[in-house]
């Protein structure tokens, strides 16, 4: 007989599914705005970048956040996570020498209730 999943595990699975859905919504939003998705869920030893996209000579590394409200989503990216994203982006650029770009930046896409997308371009910078 299998044990019932714990409440924490059920909540975690639901959060994971919401996150996947938010990434799909964010990716579609980027494409509607002229971006080409280069990678989805790009994994590195420093962590995962949700979306890597390019438009013209600009590459963006996107973190997707899914929250019920804009303010809580905007506040959910900490300094340690920013550092991990920067390290992961540097590794991805080195691992993909075929990517041609003049500029790169870090964007945050906030997906809130009703799949509304709020785009924060150049959300943080390399220090």
From Swiss-Prot:
Pfam families: UPF0102. It comes from the Bacteria. GO terms for molecular function: nucleic acid binding. HAMAP family: UPF0102. Belongs to the UPF0102 family. This is UPF0102 protein GDI1964/Gdia_0189. It comes from Gluconacetobacter diazotrophicus (strain ATCC 49037 / DSM 5601 / CCUG 37298 / CIP 103539 / LMG 7603 / PAl5).
